[in-house]
């Protein structure tokens, strides 16, 4: 059987890692080819991961990745100016566990140069799936040119300004997410620089005003990239029973909880079951859609209590949460509200009860921000 992966961005590399690992350790007989267009460059920003990701690096590269792949540890997320109760809220990861920060271009180069399981790379721009001789194709070629075959996901943001700050010695070991008058800003400490991004809505704040506020609040001198975006989910993620979508080709949501990398891994797990374990297309698509909608609803929940700023953006963001159906999250909150501290402590090492979040994480946001 032959599997072709299109694109060597984050999702393409994760897909290659996933299926190459199972080929080696479960003796899955599959030929893997990764095809990419070298003219397409990664978005120039830092990347945070969820807790599952270091384990996948270890499974593919062993402990050597710690010394040869430039990363910083991520021990949690610091929320600043969210809600009305506290100026700062730190969401810690369970003791002894951590996620990572890194640059996507360095991650992608590392995977393609060090994946210790045979696969071939080909630099080519593929126009038609029918031109590919493969039993299955995983398409990870990024943002679609048209959203005709996609549903819109609900979120108050649609643009980001990307920049860098000079590296600090002994910098923090977590991601900062700071609420601003226009939305929020991420701060990701990398080995050689600080990646910082200002997220906002162009229907509320002009790009020029956002640039001005970004520079004023965070001391940014040069803005590297203006990144407008839509938030969406494919209506059909398995096409003609053999083309499987992943990465931004499958869905896109804002990066507030750094859910992208963990979601790409989860999607690969579903596709593995579809290809090798006989899971149906209908069940596979249902599970992926359910996963993405849970992420969509919990991210939107972060805006429910507003922020330190009573601005037009935050009024609209709170209203958006109020008028949007969050049935999946509401069911989870109803259960979690009544859980004891002992019950919650038993979930600390959970890989995720509600998409990527154990009950402890959701309860913390409810108690410290939203209630």
Regions found by a protein language model. Name each.
Residues 1-11:
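Beta1/beta-strand and adjacent pyrophosphate-binding region of the FAD-binding site
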Residues 38-87:
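N-terminal FAD cofactor-binding segment of flavoenzymes
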Residues 110-219:
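Predominantly flavin-linked oxidoreductase catalytic cores and closely associated redox partners
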Residues 200-304:
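FAD/FMN-dependent oxidoreductases across multiple families
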